[in-house]
From Swiss-Prot:
Coiled coil: none annotated. Belongs to the G-protein coupled receptor 1 family. Adrenergic receptor subfamily. ADRA2B sub-subfamily. It comes from the Eukaryota. GO terms for cellular component: cell surface; plasma membrane. GO terms for biological process: angiogenesis; G protein-coupled receptor signaling pathway; MAPK cascade; platelet activation; regulation of smooth muscle contraction; regulation of vasoconstriction. It comes from Mus musculus (Mouse). Interacts with RAB26. Interacts with PPP1R9B. Interacts with GGA1, GGA2 and GGA3. PANTHER family: ADRENERGIC RECEPTOR-RELATED G-PROTEIN COUPLED RECEPTOR (PTHR24248), ALPHA-2B ADRENERGIC RECEPTOR (PTHR24248:SF130). This is Alpha-2B adrenergic receptor. The record marks 181, 185 as: Implicated in catechol agonist binding. A lipid is attached at residue 445 (S-palmitoyl cysteine). It is found in: Cell membrane.
Length: 453
């Protein structure tokens, strides 16, 4: 089907048409390239293979569909001033437009809920956060978007007369549909996301305050500890689980018998003795050397990369200093204390590698979760800024069509600002997330190297 043969006034001058066409063509290409890069990064980068990143793959796919199936036809409709294509395709085009836009914001809503559950119910939810579960949530997101986008195909509403006899392709103008679709596609998910992120902020703030209190408490406790004796080991230090037959030498020399220590194999009463983070200043040097070779290169490397962005407050289950493990009585004889220290080095050398490796991995994971939550907050904020003007003016026209209608030119500007959002997520990931930065650099450099050869 071809367009009408009649002559009509073009909406833009030749220069404006060329500029708009060039800008939108660049937008289309950049959107496809950037979001394809996001999909490749998640599927090929080890640091981005977490199940929750499948949300980003689906979101990027929706943005690519907007760039390929929606924006080109919107551009033609804008520049020509009428709908050049088949009437049936107009109805499908409008339904797909609503589908992809709704899918994007419902994806962001699902991501924010995933963040909230990961923060508020970390142990319980992380064990259930499997790829299969995430895929089911993504399928539900697309089904919700499809339900909201179906009415334009089923009920077309009252058809307005076409100006100058030219075919037009416009959104449903029924007030009930405008309000229902705006609430379901934008305002309700936005409200959910805002409330969820406020809750995440409250939880993070509370954890931060608890962490500062724990730090102050540990600082006061350390200030009361006795100064270390010769050799760098505190004079009051002992390792629980250490008992030596040579401790009887102290009794034979006239020293009082020290209090009973726990037998090997018993669980220490101090819960902090169960996990030893790598606080080097508090560990014997031989243990430090042992730790350097046994803690796992991958965990240390990840922690070093995230060092500048590590959370200020660690969970309270992670002890602030391994020095808290050592806490023996002052009257313990020197011979027994030295022997206990030596045996303590042997004991620590067996366990510190595993414990501190787990500590580093947990620390790196928490840092990555924190940064990823911040990135998603930026993504949601940018989405709201881009789409709010359109949905607000669209709803306003349905509430009071006579007096509150937004001028057509301004409405079209809001319309295109919303489309621009599809190209922004890859930029946000690049600016705010070093895992994506490294993955993008690796993919692009590999492609350029292969092309150069």
């Amino acid at each position: 089907m071809s367009g009408p043969a009649m002559v009509h006034q073009e909406p833009y001058s030749v220069q404006a048409t060329a500029a708009i066409a060039s800008a939108i063509t660049f937008l289309i290409l950049f959107t496809i390239f950037g979001n394809a890069l996001v999909i490749l990064a998640v599927l090929t980068s080890r640091s981005l293979r977490a199940p929750q990143n499948l949300f980003l793959v689906s979101l990027a796919a929706a943005d690519i569909l907007v760039a390929t199936l929606i924006i080109p036809f919107s551009l033609a409709n804008e520049l020509l001033g009428y709908w050049y294509f088949w009437r049936a395709w107009c109805e499908v085009y409008l339904a797909l437009d609503v589908l992809f836009c709704t899918s994007s914001i419902v994806h962001l809503c699902a991501i924010s809920l995933d963040r909230y559950w990961a923060v508020s119910r970390a142990l319980e939810y992380n064990s259930k956060r499997t790829p299969r579960r995430i895929k089911c949530i993504i399928l539900t997101v697309w089904l919700i978007a499809a339900v909201i986008s179906l009415p334009p195909l089923i009920y077309k509403g009252d058809q307005r007369p076409e100006p100058h006899g030219l075919p037009q392709c416009e959104l449903n103008q029924e007030a009930w549909y405008i309000l229902a679709s705006s609430i379901g596609s934008f305002f309700a998910p936005c409200l959910i996301m805002i409330l969820v992120y406020l809750r995440i902020y409250v939880i993070a703030k509370r954890s931060h305050c608890r962490g500062l209190g724990a730090k102050r408490g540990s600082g006061e406790g350390e200030s009361k500890k006795p100064h270390p004796a010769a050799g760098g080991v505190p004079a009051s230090a002992k390792v629980p689980t250490l008992v030596s037959p040579l401790s009887s030498v102290g009794e034979a020399n006239g020293h009082p018998k020290p209090p009973r220590e726990k037998e090997e194999g018993e669980t220490p009463e101090d819960p902090e003795a169960r996990a030893l983070p790598p606080n080097w200043s508090a560990l014997p040097r031989s243990v430090q050397d042992q730790k350097k070779g046994t803690s796992g290169a991958t965990a240390e490397k990840g922690a070093e990369e995230d060092e500048e962005e590590v959370e200020e407050c660690e969970p309270q289950t992670l002890p602030a200093s391994p020095a808290s493990v050592f806490n023996p009585p002052l009257q313990q004889p020197q011979t027994s204390r030295v022997l206990a220290t030596l045996r303590g080095q042997v004991l620590l050398s067996k366990n510190v590698g595993v414990a501190s490796g787990q500590w580093w991995r947990r620390r790196t994971q928490l840092s990555r979760e924190k940064r990823f939550t911040f990135v998603l907050a930026v993504v949601i904020g940018v989405f709201v800024v881009c789409w709010f003007p359109f949905f607000f003016s669209y709803s306003l026209g349905a509430i009071c069509p006579q007096h509150c209608k937004v001028p057509h030119g301004l409405f079209q500007f809001f319309f295109w600002i919303g489309y621009c959002n599809s190209s922004l997520n890859p930029v946000i990931y690049t600016i705010f997330n070093q895992d994506f930065r490294r993955a993008f650099r690796r993919i692009l450099c590999r492609q350029w190297t292969q092309t150069g050869w």
